[in-house]
Amino acid sequence: MALSTITCAALAGCADACKGSIETTVLFAKPAPGGGRNVYVDVTNKPDLGLKKTLLYEGKEFGTFEHVVIINDPTSKYASTRSICFSKFRQGPAVTGGDLTEAGIPQLVVEE
């Protein structure tokens, strides 16, 4: 146990415990049209929430993920995070127009 604590402290990148019933892995973020960021995540434990999508990042294929959603992050609260956990959210309209590879991806606003 002491070894894991020392290792965690030495790495300075240990993840916080998940505080929410829905767990996601952050893929990347893009500037949002109205300010803030759109955070693209893969939902790890609630498969009915996202869509299987092949995503592009800066014009290049980033990968195919099973349960993609976009989290609206107007205050950049989730900058530099590897995962986002939450229980309450509002679902916004799915992406339309713009990048065709993103069409239909559900958008969420996390309410904690």
Outline where the language-model segments fall:
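Short nucleic-acid-contacting surface segments enriched for D/E, G, S/T with interspersed K/R
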Residues: 64-86
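Short, cysteine-centered beta-strand-loop-beta hairpins and adjacent loop/turn segments enriched
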Residues: 47-54, 93-94
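Sec-dependent bacterial lipoprotein signal peptides
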Residues: 1-15
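OB-fold/S1-family single-stranded nucleic acid-binding modules
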Residues: 91-112
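Sequence contexts marking disulfide-bonded cysteines in secreted/extracellular proteins
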Residues: 13-19, 84-86, 98-102
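Structural detector for short beta-strands of small beta-barrel domains
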Residues: 17-49
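A mature extracytoplasmic/lumenal domain signature
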Residues: 45, 88-90
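Short, basic/aromatic beta-hairpin or loop at an interaction surface
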Residues: 51-65
